[in-house]
Protein backbone atom coordinates (compact mmCIF):
# COMPACT_ATOMS: atom_id res chain seq x y z
CA UNK A 1 0.00 0.00 0.00
CA UNK A 2 1.20 3.48 -0.94
CA UNK A 3 2.47 5.83 1.81
CA UNK A 4 -0.21 8.44 2.67
CA UNK A 5 -0.86 10.85 5.53
CA UNK A 6 -4.15 12.17 6.93
CA UNK A 7 -4.28 15.34 9.01
CA UNK A 8 -7.35 16.07 11.12
CA UNK A 9 -8.03 19.58 12.40
CA UNK A 10 -11.08 19.96 14.59
CA UNK A 11 -13.23 22.22 16.67
CA UNK A 12 -12.91 21.52 20.38
CA UNK A 13 -15.25 18.66 21.43
CA UNK A 14 -16.35 17.93 17.85
CA UNK A 15 -15.19 14.29 18.15
CA UNK A 16 -12.30 14.98 15.79
CA UNK A 17 -9.81 12.95 17.83
CA UNK A 18 -12.24 10.04 18.07
CA UNK A 19 -12.91 10.17 14.32
CA UNK A 20 -9.17 10.25 13.58
CA UNK A 21 -8.61 7.23 15.82
CA UNK A 22 -11.50 5.29 14.22
CA UNK A 23 -10.25 6.06 10.70
CA UNK A 24 -6.72 4.99 11.61
CA UNK A 25 -8.01 1.74 13.13
CA UNK A 26 -10.06 0.99 10.01
CA UNK A 27 -7.01 1.61 7.82
CA UNK A 28 -4.57 -0.21 10.11
CA UNK A 29 -2.26 2.80 10.45
CA UNK A 30 -1.08 4.71 13.54
CA UNK A 31 -2.94 7.75 14.85
CA UNK A 32 -0.77 10.42 16.45
CA UNK A 33 -2.57 12.68 18.90
CA UNK A 34 -1.72 12.83 22.60
CA UNK A 35 1.33 10.63 21.99
CA UNK A 36 2.84 13.69 20.29
CA UNK A 37 2.82 15.38 23.69
CA UNK A 38 4.62 12.40 25.25
CA UNK A 39 7.23 12.26 22.47
CA UNK A 40 7.94 15.99 22.80
CA UNK A 41 8.17 15.77 26.59
CA UNK A 42 10.81 13.03 26.20
CA UNK A 43 12.84 14.79 23.52
CA UNK A 44 12.68 18.49 24.44
CA UNK A 45 13.18 20.83 27.37
CA UNK A 46 9.42 21.21 27.86
CA UNK A 47 7.22 19.67 30.55
CA UNK A 48 4.22 17.61 29.46
CA UNK A 49 1.72 20.12 30.92
CA UNK A 50 3.36 23.02 29.08
CA UNK A 51 3.21 21.09 25.79
CA UNK A 52 -0.43 20.10 26.32
CA UNK A 53 -1.44 23.69 27.00
CA UNK A 54 0.74 25.43 24.41
CA UNK A 55 1.09 22.92 21.56
CA UNK A 56 -2.19 23.95 19.89
CA UNK A 57 -3.44 26.98 21.77
CA UNK A 58 -2.44 30.62 21.90
CA UNK A 59 -1.45 31.69 25.40
CA UNK A 60 -3.93 33.18 27.83
CA UNK A 61 -3.79 36.97 27.88
CA UNK A 62 -2.61 36.90 31.49
CA UNK A 63 0.45 34.86 30.42
CA UNK A 64 1.08 36.74 27.18
CA UNK A 65 3.49 39.31 28.62
CA UNK A 66 5.49 36.62 30.39
CA UNK A 67 5.90 34.55 27.23
CA UNK A 68 6.64 37.53 24.97
CA UNK A 69 9.38 38.76 27.25
CA UNK A 70 10.78 35.29 28.00
CA UNK A 71 12.90 34.86 24.88
CA UNK A 72 16.17 33.04 24.45
CA UNK A 73 19.36 34.45 22.91
CA UNK A 74 17.96 33.83 19.39
CA UNK A 75 14.86 35.91 20.16
CA UNK A 76 12.50 32.94 20.24
CA UNK A 77 9.86 32.46 22.90
CA UNK A 78 9.23 29.11 24.56
CA UNK A 79 6.12 28.71 22.40
CA UNK A 80 8.16 29.40 19.23
CA UNK A 81 10.68 26.73 20.24
CA UNK A 82 7.89 24.29 21.05
CA UNK A 83 6.25 24.90 17.65
CA UNK A 84 9.57 24.28 15.85
CA UNK A 85 10.18 21.04 17.77
CA UNK A 86 6.60 19.91 17.19
CA UNK A 87 6.79 20.68 13.44
CA UNK A 88 10.00 18.66 13.16
CA UNK A 89 8.37 15.73 14.99
CA UNK A 90 5.32 15.86 12.67
CA UNK A 91 7.60 15.72 9.62
CA UNK A 92 9.42 12.72 11.14
CA UNK A 93 6.16 10.88 11.88
CA UNK A 94 4.89 11.51 8.34
CA UNK A 95 8.20 10.32 6.86
CA UNK A 96 8.10 7.07 8.86
CA UNK A 97 4.98 5.80 7.11
CA UNK A 98 1.26 6.16 6.59
CA UNK A 99 -0.48 7.70 9.59
CA UNK A 100 -3.16 10.05 10.90
CA UNK A 101 -1.99 13.21 12.70
CA UNK A 102 -4.45 15.19 14.82
CA UNK A 103 -4.21 18.98 15.08
CA UNK A 104 -1.01 20.92 15.74
CA UNK A 105 -1.05 22.76 12.38
CA UNK A 106 -0.13 19.44 10.73
CA UNK A 107 -1.81 20.23 7.41
CA UNK A 108 0.30 23.39 7.22
CA UNK A 109 3.54 21.79 8.40
CA UNK A 110 3.12 18.97 5.85
CA UNK A 111 1.65 21.14 3.07
CA UNK A 112 4.36 20.25 0.54
CA UNK A 113 3.53 16.54 0.60
CA UNK A 114 1.57 15.17 -2.37
CA UNK A 115 0.27 12.21 -0.32
CA UNK A 116 -1.74 14.32 2.14
CA UNK A 117 -5.48 14.23 2.93
CA UNK A 118 -6.43 17.33 4.96
CA UNK A 119 -9.62 16.99 7.03
CA UNK A 120 -11.52 19.48 9.19
CA UNK A 121 -14.14 18.23 11.69
CA UNK A 122 -16.82 20.50 13.11
CA UNK A 123 -20.03 19.96 15.09
CA UNK A 124 -23.00 22.02 16.19
CA UNK A 125 -22.79 23.74 19.56
CA UNK A 126 -25.36 21.49 21.29
CA UNK A 127 -23.40 18.36 20.33
CA UNK A 128 -20.16 19.94 21.48
CA UNK A 129 -21.67 20.91 24.84
CA UNK A 130 -22.91 17.32 25.27
CA UNK A 131 -19.42 16.03 24.44
CA UNK A 132 -17.88 18.45 26.95
CA UNK A 133 -20.14 16.97 29.65
CA UNK A 134 -19.28 13.39 28.57
CA UNK A 135 -15.59 14.19 28.98
CA UNK A 136 -16.23 15.69 32.46
CA UNK A 137 -14.47 18.92 31.54
CA UNK A 138 -15.18 21.76 33.96
CA UNK A 139 -16.43 24.55 31.69
CA UNK A 140 -17.57 26.84 34.48
CA UNK A 141 -20.91 28.63 34.17
CA UNK A 142 -20.96 28.83 30.38
CA UNK A 143 -20.02 25.72 28.41
CA UNK A 144 -20.73 27.54 25.15
CA UNK A 145 -18.33 30.35 26.04
CA UNK A 146 -15.72 27.82 27.15
CA UNK A 147 -15.89 26.10 23.75
CA UNK A 148 -15.74 29.42 21.90
CA UNK A 149 -12.69 30.43 23.95
CA UNK A 150 -10.88 27.14 23.21
CA UNK A 151 -11.55 27.52 19.50
CA UNK A 152 -10.48 31.18 19.58
CA UNK A 153 -7.18 30.15 21.16
CA UNK A 154 -6.68 27.43 18.53
CA UNK A 155 -7.48 29.91 15.78
CA UNK A 156 -5.03 32.47 17.20
CA UNK A 157 -2.29 29.84 17.59
CA UNK A 158 -2.83 28.62 14.03
CA UNK A 159 -2.72 32.12 12.58
CA UNK A 160 0.36 33.08 14.61
CA UNK A 161 2.31 30.16 13.14
CA UNK A 162 0.85 29.98 9.62
CA UNK A 163 -0.63 33.37 8.64
CA UNK A 164 -3.64 31.33 7.51
CA UNK A 165 -7.15 31.23 8.93
CA UNK A 166 -7.83 28.05 10.91
CA UNK A 167 -10.93 26.22 9.69
CA UNK A 168 -11.14 28.05 6.33
CA UNK A 169 -12.39 25.62 3.69
CA UNK A 170 -9.62 26.34 1.18
CA UNK A 171 -7.07 24.84 3.59
CA UNK A 172 -8.69 21.40 3.70
CA UNK A 173 -9.68 18.71 1.22
CA UNK A 174 -12.87 17.89 3.13
CA UNK A 175 -14.85 19.24 6.08
CA UNK A 176 -17.16 16.92 8.03
CA UNK A 177 -19.99 17.71 10.44
CA UNK A 178 -19.84 15.02 13.12
CA UNK A 179 -23.18 16.02 14.67
CA UNK A 180 -24.88 15.40 11.34
CA UNK A 181 -23.11 12.18 10.30
CA UNK A 182 -21.72 10.68 13.52
CA UNK A 183 -18.17 9.62 14.31
CA UNK A 184 -18.29 6.21 12.60
CA UNK A 185 -19.63 7.57 9.30
CA UNK A 186 -17.10 10.42 9.29
CA UNK A 187 -14.28 7.94 9.93
CA UNK A 188 -15.57 5.74 7.11
CA UNK A 189 -15.63 8.68 4.69
CA UNK A 190 -12.04 9.56 5.61
CA UNK A 191 -10.92 5.94 5.15
CA UNK A 192 -12.64 5.75 1.75
CA UNK A 193 -11.00 8.98 0.58
CA UNK A 194 -7.61 7.82 1.88
CA UNK A 195 -7.84 4.70 -0.26
CA UNK A 196 -8.45 6.88 -3.34
CA UNK A 197 -5.32 9.00 -2.80
Regions found by a protein language model. Give the residues of each.
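ATP-dependent small-molecule kinase phosphotransfer cores
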Residues: 41-98
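Short beta-strand-centered segment that lines the nucleotide-binding/catalytic pocket of NTP-utilizing
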Residues: 30-41
